[in-house]
Amino acid sequence: MPTINVNKIDLEKLINMSLSDKTIDHKFPMMGVEVEEIFEENNQKIVQFSINPDRPDYLSVEGLARGFRGFIGIDAGLPKYDIYASDLEVYVENVKSRPYCGFAIIKNIIIDDLVLESIINLQEKLHWSIGRDRKKMAIGIHDLDKIEAPFYYKEINGDEIEFEPLGHNELMTPKEVLEKHEKGVKYAHLLRGDKFPIIVDKNNAVISMPPIINGNLTKVGTETRNLLVEITGTDKNAVENTLNIIVCALADRRGTIFSLKLINNGNETISPDLTPDSAEITIDEINTRLGLNLNAGEIIACLKKARYDAQYSYEDENIKITIPAYRTDILNNMDIIKDVAINYGYENFNGNLPVVATIGEKHDIEKKFEFIRNTMIGYGLFEVMNLTLSNQDVLFNKMNENIEDNEYVEVLKPASIEHRVVRPTILPLLLETLANNKHNELPQKIFEVGDCVVIDEKDETLYTHCKNVPKVSAVITHHNANFNEIKGLVEGLIREMNIEYSIDNYKHPSFIEGRCAKIIVDDEIVGYFGELHPEVILNFELGYPVVGFEMEIK
């Protein structure tokens, strides 16, 4: 879990009360935020918090203070953030590498050393958590008074413009930034092709080269009073969610929020948008999940402590909830129920010890997983662990498969478009891992063992009509990767598992015809292997031959 270091005086100032170390140690964990340690640094008391990944709004001292004020009853209900319209415009062109953007203006903010440190730390934590190290989104915060509107977000050639990158006094082109600047070298893999995203002002002064570096011109300091916030990325939800979190944090510092008009091919949108979300939940649903007997008033009180607005509808006999825009973690009613539990107080729940003592042991499938892991590692492969959620593009389109020819389980309310399908296969995710590591040396040999989810109309478990299928998959890439190499790996693994099998020719759209085989056990096809089709290799932007296999674990 990510950790943040918070200056205790700054935290107390935002909460508007003094806090003893004992209070911090006791109260914050009950709010769902672990206190790692309290220590002194440069004669200042520092509190280190461990933040759950599902609460990115807690990655700043402003967010923690906002949540704590509600938790202890200083504030209640939805925080109010006024947005004033500015006359500033941003012209957005078609930026293929990072097509989504969001902008906001914060005026009249007082920035001292603590505020500046908080802004920088929040940026970096959000880059890692929501941004996946700037892949999904990147943040830029600038001194507004040093630039002139309108602003332009567009693509340019690598040598089309020169600017001073942040922290440097040397003029560089975008191409030179990727070759010479430490941030450019580190994040060059995020920009492919000969066009580079850039944000400039009316006078063509460079504000930012996302997701790499800001311009030196707009560097923020303690003298800054007005800010331009820009978020760009590959994931629309990530961009919008990040902008909301940052804008609310800066508003909690008494900054005033102003919107801008984004103009894209004649279409106009206003940014930021802090419109609250809404949800409905019944009293029975909450009480059944928590094992409590709360009435509507008690539930609403808990919800308001969690900084929701809530009211009971006698007509519908449910509770209507308004969710603040910075709560990007709310996916369904279970998240709301968890907040009710936290603000009811975990210490108020009664626990009963089980009547019968039990001793756990590894499930048979876990024993097989462990055996396969050890065998694959013995063959010189590295284990990776991908997310169970992916998307149709990675799982099917890039694998030369028609989506219509495949059945899969789709998430009802995905957190992002990149994670809306439960994987029915592992192989595409391994290819995506290779794509993310193509800047590393060859050969690369990786495998994964884990569950996939497939449609099964006969399965009545929880009425889902789907089931888990354990699988093992591996890929190998280097200059001379070939069919015989992957065939030897597959046969070696199956022999180690002491399974009778046979191999026959197989036609699969992801593999080269004539260089693909199926694995047959008990007259049933349990897997396949071979040389990946050149189109698949190009779809994942890989530069060398790739071989791979995937097999069910019976």
From Swiss-Prot:
Disulfide bridge map: none
One GO cellular component, as annotated: phenylalanine-tRNA ligase complex
Catalytic activity as recorded in UniProt: tRNA(Phe) + L-phenylalanine + ATP = L-phenylalanyl-tRNA(Phe) + AMP + diphosphate + H(+)
Enzyme class: ligase
Binding-site positions, Mg(2+): D329, D335, D339
GO molecular function per UniProt: ATP binding; magnesium ion binding; phenylalanine-tRNA ligase activity; RNA binding
A Pfam entry, by short name: PhetRS_B1
Name of the molecule in the record: Phenylalanine--tRNA ligase beta subunit
Naturally occurring in which organism (per UniProt): Methanococcus aeolicus (strain ATCC BAA-1280 / DSM 17508 / OCM 812 / Nankai-3)
Gene behind the chain: pheT
